[in-house]
Amino acid sequence: SVITALFPDVYIDSEVVVGNNCYIASGVKLLGSVKIGNDCIIRENTVIGSDGLTTRRDENGKVVTIPQFGGVTIEDNVQIGALTVIGKGAIDDTVIHSGCRIDNCCFISHNVQLGEDTLVVGETIMFGSSSTGKQAFISGNSTVRDGVSIGEKALVGMGSVVVKPVPDGGIVKGNPAKQKE
């Protein structure tokens, strides 16, 4: 089947590639180099491929924005909730591997890598270059610091602020997130 359902007010840039049997709800924006696999669902008013805020200070202390040249790759059988933003990679792509589920109102920043079958629950923020292994579970309203990795089958408790790597199978909770005893 090659049926892909597009609803009103969807914007798709010319570089975007959408696979077969996808559902793209109203108000979705697909920007720049975005590749979407087969059997994906993208809910209302989600933005994929937007620039993130990557900055540095110059020698005079002025903020300088660093351009981003990557894209976003979304593999097969991924579901993305409403009002979610997935930023494009700085150089390489942000990648959402097959089977992932991202809830409503999440922010997935540049260069994030979500392992297969990972669940990210509502209002979670994953900052630049953070990652998960396969089958990780990030509970709602959690924050993952830039560059931090969450291991395979690891669990992040609700409202946690993850500032250090979480090992495979680890369970963390709190602010800052600590290993559950």
Where would I find each of the regions flagged by the language model?
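Glycine-rich hexapeptide-repeat left-handed beta-helix
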Residues: S26-G27, L31-E181
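Right-handed parallel beta-helix
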Residues: S1-G37, E44
